[in-house]
Amino acid sequence: MKLPIYLDYAATTPVDPRVAEKMMQYMTMDGIFGNPASRSHRYGWQAEEAVDIARNQVAELINADPREIVFTSGATESDNLAIKGVAHFYHKKGKHIITSKTEHKAVLDTCRQLEREGFEVTYLEPESNGIIPIEKLEAAMREDTILLSLMHVNNEIGVIHDIDAIGELCRAKKVIFHVDAAQSAGKLPIDLQKSKVDLMSISAHKMYGPKGIGALYVRRKPRIRLEATMHGGGHERGMRSGTLATHQIVGMGEAAAIAKADMESDNARIRRLRDRLWDGIKHIEETYINGDAEQRYCGSLNVSFNFVEGESLMMALKDLAVSSGSACTSASLEPSYVLRALGLDDEMAHSSIRFSIGRFTTEEEIDHAIETITKSIGQLREMSPLWEMFKDGVDLSTVQWAHH
């Protein structure tokens, strides 16, 4: 068993060996290394064909038309292109955008930038289970609302939004619907022939593909127009200029094809391991799951261990690669803004750990994790005066702390 045990699949996934092997065929002189935009010779034609196949594979994963797939450098760029692209193209129709307080920074900071440009953004607060009820979304919509941006699966707590129902609402209200599916594409079934989603951001490195490549789904019927944010050679039907990274795209296509084929069996195994982990730690006193217990992706488990400081717990769990919050913000000592939006106080938010399980996690690793967590929590609480007071029946909310 390799230590530390990797339980941070929501931050990134290792590239599947089958994907890596395929990518190697598209880099060197012996392989297909040409520029897909080179139309005058075989090197270019072969590369273009490889890109077309990968585009089909990504489209099949979400049941879309391959012509609706725009390759980008990842979900962050896809989010930027979708939100800024819609805002700048449709600004004469309205300048109001709706999103939630628990979105990824790539969505929140893009919206903040648009606010500086004169757009108005409503940031909705979720219920304590992390989900925004459809009535709340409808109530926030106005005559001048042009866009709703909402994630499918939350990166920190794993809760799932019902994008089918929300899509119906948006279509009825003539509001463009963007979904950040970085955490759900390749893990949950997505059918864009059925779901009325207009734009969808996808990342390869969250589904065992390479980093640095992603896609944006842009609906053709009814047609969604975007203003480009990257200008140049007019690649990707003018929406995203820049030479296509054939080997990355091939890797993303292969990862999508494997994810589609193995989704059911992968999820059944991951769910078993997730349940095994929770069953092994739920007996620890003052331990709570964050986010809806049912409506969540099976590989995600965000747990608060009361009376344990998150950073000291992370250090105690040095044999486990886990995170507190998302990878993009786990370097900061601020409590997770997602958990704060759920109504958790600073202490509970600080004592939370995100465990995310994936394709290569084993039972042996889960059992070792349970043992490590149980032991570490016990040791840390033994040192905690707060735990001692709590066990003595002191109501800590009534304690007047002296200010030094």
UniProtKB/Swiss-Prot annotation:
Coiled coil: none annotated. It catalyses: (sulfur carrier)-H + L-cysteine = (sulfur carrier)-SH + L-alanine. It comes from the Bacteria. The keyword Iron-sulfur applies. The modification N6-(pyridoxal phosphate)lysine is found at residue 206. Pyridoxal 5'-phosphate binds at residues 75-76, 155, 183, 203-205, 243. Pfam families: Aminotran_5. One of its GO terms (molecular function) is pyridoxal phosphate binding. Master enzyme that delivers sulfur to a number of partners involved in Fe-S cluster assembly, tRNA modification or cofactor biosynthesis. Catalyzes the removal of elemental sulfur atoms from cysteine to produce alanine. Functions as a sulfur delivery protein for Fe-S cluster synthesis onto IscU, an Fe-S scaffold assembly protein, as well as other S acceptor proteins. This is Cysteine desulfurase IscS. It comes from Shewanella loihica (strain ATCC BAA-1088 / PV-4). The lineage of its organism: Bacteria, Pseudomonadati, Pseudomonadota, Gammaproteobacteria, Alteromonadales. The gene is iscS.
